């Protein structure tokens, strides 16, 4: 990953610590929570980090169950950014480029996807429970496993 992308992601994280933080809703497919990245200790830490972050104000994390199968949002991640003073924008990021979508038809398509995700995703508490269950299922046999938030 390029340095500017890392810098951009870190800058986005700073939105959480503002005096008036931005409201975020995250939808994560259950399978991404199962995808091993960086080894078992890293994955266990990441799952517990998600649990902790989901408890903070202005952040909602909802898990889309794997049992639902393929759905409209399976094509990749996106950000729908809505502003008080400006029209909404969708941001797409690929390996070597990024794209902003601004036309009403494009925005409506992504709003429909989010509405569908809102209907099928687990609720906030259920999502935290699912993440905890995955951490236990996948990593509980490790000596360094700790279920505490």
Please give the residue ranges for each predicted region.
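Hydrophobic protein-protein interaction segments
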Residues: 1-149
């Amino acid at each position: 990953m390029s340095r500017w992308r890392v810098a951009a992601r870190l800058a986005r994280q700073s939105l959480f610590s503002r005096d008036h933080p931005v409201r975020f809703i995250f939808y994560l497919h259950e399978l991404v929570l199962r995808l091993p990245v960086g080894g078992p200790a890293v994955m266990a830490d990441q799952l517990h980090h998600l649990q902790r972050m989901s408890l903070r104000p202005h952040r909602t994390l909802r898990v889309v169950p794997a049992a639902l199968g393929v759905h409209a949002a399976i094509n990749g991640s996106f950000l729908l950014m809505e502003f008080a003073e400006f029209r909404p924008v969708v941001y797409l990021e690929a390996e070597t480029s990024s794209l902003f979508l601004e036309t009403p038809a494009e925005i409506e398509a992504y709003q429909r996807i989010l509405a569908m995700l809102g209907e099928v995703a687990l609720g906030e508490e259920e999502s935290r429970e699912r993440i905890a269950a995955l951490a236990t299922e996948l990593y509980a046999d490790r000596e360094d496993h700790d279920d505490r938030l």
